[in-house]
């Protein structure tokens, strides 16, 4: 099996696009800007879903489902949110087709089936959910209300890329209501921390926790918390956001509760979400010129066993050994595949599973039967070693944990060596052009300066890091006083 991938050094963007398709993760569809997530790619998303869903439930959230369609009048109730998403909305105006009298066999929109009110295909669900919460919340005893939804949303993107930016994508969106400002802020921070925990412990991706600037903040939020990751090409990727909504949506939809004294108050809200964009982050953080590199905690197949044989007798003996290994792996919840296809040679199988990023490969041939050994190959380092049969399951279990840890350490080292402090704009432009990564610089706090820097360099403020140190300085662009550094980068 010839991989022949474009290398990252040749063309990083082309490498990514080829890899997503060649590794059977996803492909473009017949609908502009929409993708087909293939079974192998969806299996990774399912593992992500399962872990996140567990984490949400452990923090007290329940799943629900709300309509795909939002009446236009409802959508525009919270003005900032409506304005922020207006240019990306798909709109349903009619509810029926009919045969076209001028074109036999063709259909046309029935002009008599116009909706009284247009329906927006949800780009996000705050409007429909908060209009529902009005009927669910009457008293402080109904709070907090902690709801999550797994759904698809539509944002009519003009420039699309598989997983990173598509017109339709899968995601989860949490929407919570609280009795106090303090509780809502704590919820926003908690969910940012849940996302960071997931990124680091399952995706093996180090992230920076921070706050978005006013310009980058979610439309309709008072504060947006985020986690920012760095890809191998030195570009940042926003991996998750958690918004403190204040009382904006509660006031827009008149969601009130009677407090302990019987007085009516508006509730306080949050919303938070991650999407299939995480799939793109996973691919770009760890993969190499040979294909995918998957962290064991999210790999659909953690171990693949490839038999090498010439006779039916050898194949039967290897199969018996492999099936014994499989039953032992399953007891440890290690997902394993025995690639016993007789239509492909071992070399083809090695290349295929390398391309698909399976963390560990076990090869068993006639010599291994004779010597009671196995050849073990690591996908992340491409190293091989021969190990005795005795204790092999425990060894591989430990090896998977080591690979998970090593992938995180490698990504962390890359990230940390690509955070550069600069003091003036000329230095900023040089680092951005020649090195990339996060650039730590003083900023005067104004949207005007932020916009001008973006216009000149295409770099944006990714976040105001929560762990930044207090440091008075001067804005690298205007020279005005600054109270602390922020992180700039070019981004996906």
UniProtKB/Swiss-Prot annotation:
One of its GO terms (cellular component) is cytoplasm. It catalyses: tRNA(Pro) + L-proline + ATP = L-prolyl-tRNA(Pro) + AMP + diphosphate. It comes from the Bacteria. It is an enzyme of class 6 (ligase). InterPro entries: aa-tRNA-synt_IIb (IPR002314), aa-tRNA-synth_II (IPR006195), aa-tRNA-synth_II/BPL/LPL (IPR045864), Anticodon-bd (IPR004154), Anticodon-bd_dom_sf (IPR036621), Pro-tRNA-ligase_IIa_arc-type (IPR004499), Pro-tRNA_ligase_II_C (IPR016061), Pro-tRNA_synth_II (IPR017449). It is found in: Cytoplasm. Its EC number is 6.1.1.15. One of its GO terms (biological process) is prolyl-tRNA aminoacylation. Catalyzes the attachment of proline to tRNA(Pro) in a two-step reaction: proline is first activated by ATP to form Pro-AMP and then transferred to the acceptor end of tRNA(Pro). Homodimer. Belongs to the class-II aminoacyl-tRNA synthetase family. ProS type 3 subfamily. This is Proline--tRNA ligase. It comes from Flavobacterium psychrophilum (strain ATCC 49511 / DSM 21280 / CIP 103535 / JIP02/86). The gene is proS.
